[in-house]
Amino acid sequence: MRIRRRALVFATMSAVLCTAGFMPSAGEAAADNGAGEETKSYAETYRLTADDVANINALNESAPAASSAGPSFRAPDSDDRVTPPAEPLDRMPDPYRPSYGRAETVVNNYIRKWQQVYSHRDGRKQQMTEEQREWLSYGCVGVTWVNSGQYPTNRLAFASFDEDRFKNELKNGRPRSGETRAEFEGRVAKESFDEEKGFQRAREVASVMNRALENAHDESAYLDNLKKELANGNDALRNEDARSPFYSALRNTPSFKERNGGNHDPSRMKAVIYSKHFWSGQDRSSSADKRKYGDPDAFRPAPGTGLVDMSRDRNIPRSPTSPGEGFVNFDYGWFGAQTEADADKTVWTHGNHYHAPNGSLGAMHVYESKFRNWSEGYSDFDRGAYVITFIPKSWNTAPDKVKQGWP
């Protein structure tokens, strides 16, 4: 998208990420997406308030606790989140609204589509439960939560980073007019990531894992199959330590252990994918510049494997670069297990923010975006990871093909 098109696209797009913030003055939150195009903060684009930012970030930070505390958990203080009401199982969804490569709808209508298309367990449609609707009410992370069956742990994340490009740019490039050295280094690091290659790497690994799951009826058989598949493909992951999250991911998946899920039988599971966008400068002990403009060394994938160590991801948002700014801490998109080979034709499901129909944010909307729409960044984020998790094959939350909107 070139600069001359940006205003038109931003003016017509709905709030498509689980993000919000204060409306800064012109240029305050502007960044560059690596193609010579200016990207703005989500706050500037969608005119959400500083209070919205604080509420969204607080709720996002409380979500992991909610995932273990159960549906009765409520975030403290200003949590105006509301669980969407139940929808009749046989009620058909209304058409989604198309908008520049994505389809948009309200959360209640998404529940109707989910029940018709994604709810099936062993071929039978299910009504979305109160607990699932509670998960969904958290916004972008809620969409991934309800489809994966667990709050996302992000342990098995992949990305692609061009080390040579990064070094060459630092050596031969120079800051732009008005750009500090810290801004320059953060921008070059961000531009050295390739989201499409990171996504493709996650797809490659998920494919290997799915082959290893076939005909493996215990974890030992699965791990043996996995190591053979990696060796046959000369994949660098074959050298991962036995304690690596790569090898423990399946056993740490709750649905793998559930009687109505995997029941400890790997052949009943399949590897699926979701994505997380977030900020690199999360280390509170690092310099203020890194917290504002990004930490070039943080969350880089391991050479060869593409694995990203997410253990230091604390859902901490970008620090303001000027008074009054606010940035949101993350965004999630659900991919599942689509077989479409062309990344640009894949569909990513995500939400704008938590469901607050009686608050200033308003009702949650759900979006089905093509990959280019999903991966196109905002200045709130400088990292995009593509994460593998597992769901039972008996679930239909990750079908081979996803059709945008309804019908």
Swiss-Prot record:
Residues 1-31 form the signal peptide. Residues 32-76 form a propeptide. SUPFAM superfamilies: Cysteine proteinases. Transmembrane segments: none annotated. GO terms for molecular function: protein-glutamine gamma-glutamyltransferase activity. InterPro entries: Papain-like_cys_pep_sf, Transglut_prok, Transglut_prok_sf. The keyword Protein biosynthesis does not apply. Keywords: Acyltransferase, Signal, Transferase, Zymogen. Residues 76-94, 286-298 have a biased composition (Basic and acidic residues). Sold under the name Activa TG by Ajinomoto. It has the ability to cross-link protein molecules present in food without the use of salt or binders. Used to improve some of the physical properties such as firmness, elasticity and moisture retention of food such as meat, poultry and seafood. The active site is at residues 140, 331, 350. Residues 62-98, 282-322 are annotated as: Disordered. Residues 62-72 have a biased composition (Low complexity). It catalyses: L-glutaminyl-[protein] + L-lysyl-[protein] = [protein]-L-lysyl-N(6)-5-L-glutamyl-[protein] + NH4(+). The keyword Chloroplast does not apply. Catalyzes the cross-linking of proteins and the conjugation of polyamines to proteins. This is Protein-glutamine gamma-glutamyltransferase. It comes from Streptomyces mobaraensis.
